[in-house]
UniProtKB/Swiss-Prot annotation:
Active site: K122 (n6-amp-lysine intermediate)
Catalytic reaction annotation: NAD(+) + (deoxyribonucleotide)n-3'-hydroxyl + 5'-phospho-(deoxyribonucleotide)m = (deoxyribonucleotide)n+m + AMP + beta-nicotinamide D-nucleotide
Binding residues annotated for NAD(+), in chain numbering: D41, S42, V43, Y44, D45, S90, L91, E120, R143, E177, K293, K317
Enzyme Commission (EC) number: 6.5.1.2
Organism this protein belongs to: Lactiplantibacillus plantarum (strain ATCC BAA-793 / NCIMB 8826 / WCFS1) (Lactobacillus plantarum)
Gene Ontology, cellular component aspect: cytosol
Protein name per UniProt: DNA ligase
Lineage of the organism: Bacteria, Bacillati, Bacillota, Bacilli, Lactobacillales
Keyword tags: DNA damage, DNA repair, DNA replication, Ligase, Magnesium, Manganese, Metal-binding, NAD, Zinc
Its biological purpose: DNA ligase that catalyzes the formation of phosphodiester linkages between 5'-phosphoryl and 3'-hydroxyl groups in double-stranded DNA using NAD as a coenzyme and as the energy source for the reaction. It is essential for DNA replication and repair of damaged DNA.
GO molecular function terms listed in the Swiss-Prot or TrEMBL record: DNA ligase (NAD+) activity; metal ion binding
Length: 679
């Protein structure tokens, strides 16, 4: 345990403070400038609080480069600098209800009366400033070091939640948080891991890394969102409280987090904290605490700020939800693109409301950095409240005979040599006949966003492949009822149901087939753009790299991947076989040249889908809504116009009812779609 500062000499304190500054500044550089932290927040906070303690006891030790005097990071090369006329400050932190009570007591003693507080969720993202002149968006910037940030205007203009024009012609500088929703983060990491690229540690890093992309097309693809919560200068607004300011923001067209609450007592504040500490895993985005702000705006102005933090607000940081467990094994598995991924197998533990027994170790570089070994006691947490991740190893409990993990040199599925492709951190099997890759490819082909063959999952596909009934996707369409009845747990009715689902998938539009084929870098959105442009698979197969790259500024990486895929003789044979079994290879959706239906009732509406839909898939419903001019949102807020609720709808439906938002059941939505088709 560290010595108490009041028992130390100045020299001892100076030595420790210097070491802490060096360590903390290096961690800050990794966090802010590289978007790649190498230490848990709780460890950083512990070191930071120790430095604060030393500097408070020995004020002469405070230096201009101390992390206690700095805000954010440096300005990254490649972006123009933006000077914030009014600095973008960070927040002070507390870690216990007792510390929070002390902050409130000091504030109220200072002003001489009790204060109402606005409680807001602390979004785990990247601070953002948006500048509007006469109601028009003219600039977006990062916080940077608080005084000078990065001009990311081109990137933020691709984010759907940021209005290009306000509902009033105000000249304002609005601050908020840019974040990546949990679902978008999980999908992005899945794509990166499949492509052999380094994964992001958490949604905050993913959002920061995305906003700092020099190619704004990448930003557009990654589904970032924002919540705005503050303003540089209160004057342009009519609001007199923090809570009313958020409502005014929403009226201006900004996305705000609707889950704020005005607290009239500390009992209200603590109740809010307890509620969202429990609800945290259920939210669609990551939070790492609660922000408590004095609600009256005139009081905020009179209290002002220190060089680093406002005096009228504080962040209550949630304690890390970590559990120790035993690492029993490491399994190496092969994905559909050939990437070989290590997975830690552990004693099951309860973490953030779920039982966790497995965690990805991503790639050999990650394994080496963590130095995990069989038999280790490890600390497990959920990165961004989503993905189980080993945060550290308890070296004191490491068995004496524990050995470093052996990185495989041959494929665990087919035995082919593993390779490192250029610019990849992943190990990859490049044998196209690898059984694991073939099976994973079949699973992907049948998945909901691809050919949507209901009932054809990994268990049945494994049996079909093992029994040599299917060796490629075309073989699915040659299956017979007699063959299906030879499989385990397949009876007469389920065989007929599966054959019906397979038969129905023959009529899917071309974009589903393209996505289902598993072409590298071709996700569902890219597949739709390509299908819209070319119309038929024959036209696509004859297209040049330049033609494909020019589609909606798609670029060379995707175009090269598509061209290389269709250069294969085996792929040509597969396409002919699919056509021979009557699988559709033409595009059947709305034309790329036809604008969204501006005359539709849905035009301009913000719609949320929730619950289980029986008549159609969620992607199909989303595509239909978008084609009719709607914006499909991931969460319910005061700005939501309509919620379409299937069966087993949960918190989104409840929130819609609380906010008095129009709710349709699936039957009404289906009827609307049918009427539109007949019109």
């Amino acid at each position: 345990m560290a010595d108490k500062p009041n028992t130390m000499t100045v020299e001892q304190a100076a030595d420790e403070a210097a070491a802490l500054r060096q360590t903390l500044n290096e961690w800050r550089r990794q966090y802010y400038d590289e978007d790649a932290p190498n230490v848990e927040d709780s460890v950083y906070d512990q070191k930071y609080e120790r430095l604060v303690e030393l500097e408070q006891t020995f004020p002469q030790l405070v230096t201009p480069d101390s992390p206690t005097q700095l805000v954010g990071g440096t300005v990254k090369a490649g972006f123009d600098k933006v000077t914030h006329e009014i600095p973008m400050l960070s927040l002070g932190d507390v870690f216990s209800q007792a510390e929070l009570q002390e902050f409130v007591d000091r504030l109220e003693q200072n002003v001489g009366h009790p204060v109402d507080y606005n409680c807001e969720l602390k979004i785990d993202g990247l601070a953002l400033s948006l500048r509007y002149e006469d109601g028009v968006l003219v600039q977006g910037s990062t916080r940077g070091n608080g005084t000078v940030g990065e001009d990311i205007t081109a990137n933020i203009k691709t984010i759907k939640s940021i209005p290009q024009r306000l509902t009033r012609p105000l000249t304002i500088d609005v601050r908020g948080e840019c974040y990546m929703p949990k679902a978008a983060f999980a999908a992005l990491n899945e794509r990166r891991e499949a492509a052999g690229e380094p994964v992001f540690a958490n949604p905050r890093n993913a959002a920061a890394g995305t906003l700092r992309q020099l190619d704004s097309r990448v930003v557009a693809e990654r589904q970032l969102s924002t919540f705005m919560y503050n303003i540089a200068d209160y004057e342009p607004l009519t609001a007199r409280t923090q809570s009313d300011m958020l409502t005014e923001f929403a009226d201006l067209g900004f996305a705000i987090n609707p889950d704020f609450k005005v607290a009239h007592s500390m009992a209200d504040v603590f109740s809010y904290i307890d509620h969202y500490q429990n609800e945290r895993p259920e939210l669609a985005y990551g939070i790492d605490g609660i922000v408590i702000k004095a609600n009256p705006l005139p009081l905020q102005r009179s209290l002002g700020a220190t060089v680093k933090v406002p005096r009228w607000a504080i962040a209550f940081k949630f304690p890390p939800d970590e559990q120790p467990t035993l690492l029993k094994d490491v399994e190496w598995t092969v994905g559909r693109t050939g990437v070989v991924t290590p997975t830690a197998v552990m004693e099951p533990v309860q973490l953030a409301g779920t039982t966790v027994a497995r965690a990805s170790l991503h790639n050999p570089d990650y394994v080496a950095a963590k130095d995990v070994r069989i038999g280790d006691t490890v600390l497990l947490h959920k990165a961004g409240d989503i993905i189980p991740e080993i945060s550290s190893v308890d070296l004191a409990k490491r068995p004496k005979d524990a050995q470093p993990l052996v990185i495989p040199t041959t494929c665990p599925s087919c035995g082919a040599p593993l390779v490192h492709l250029e610019d990849e951190v992943a190990l990859r099997c490049i044998n196209p006949k690898c059984p694991a890759q073939v099976q994973e490819g079949l699973v992907h082909f049948a998945s909901r966003n691809a050919m949507n063959i209901d009932g054809l999952g990994p268990r049945i596909i494994a049996q079909l492949y093992a029994n040599r009934l299917v060796s490629d996707v075309a073989g699915l369409y040659r299956l017979t009822k007699a063959q299906l009845l030879t499989l385990d747990k397949i009876k007469d009715k389920s065989a007929e149901k599966l054959l019906t689902a397979i038969d129905r998938s023959r009529d899917n539009s071309l974009e589903r087939l393209l996505f289902g084929l598993g072409i590298r870098h071709v996700g569902a959105k890219v597949a739709r753009l390509i299908a819209q442009h070319f119309g038929t698979i024959e036209a696509l197969m004859a297209a040049s790299q330049e033609e494909i790259a020019a589609i909606d500024s798609m670029g060379d990486v995707i175009a090269n991947a598509v061209v290389q895929y269709f250069e294969s003789d085996e792929v040509h044979t597969l396409i002919r076989e699919l056509q021979a079994v009557n699988v559709n290879t033409t595009y059947q959706g709305p034309s790329a040249t036809v604008a969204e239906d501006s005359n539709s009732w849905f035009a301009g509406k913000r719609v949320v889908l929730t619950g289980k839909l029986e008549s159609f898939t969620r992607p199909d419903a989303t595509q239909w809504l978008q084609a009719h001019g709607a914006t499909v949102m991931g969460s319910v807020s005061k700005k939501t116009d309509l919620v379409i609720a299937g069966s087993d709808a949960g918190s989104k439906l409840q929130k819609a009812q609380q906010l008095d938002i129009t709710v349709w059941d699936e039957a009404r939505f289906s009827e609307t779609m049918r009427e539109d088709a007949q019109a």
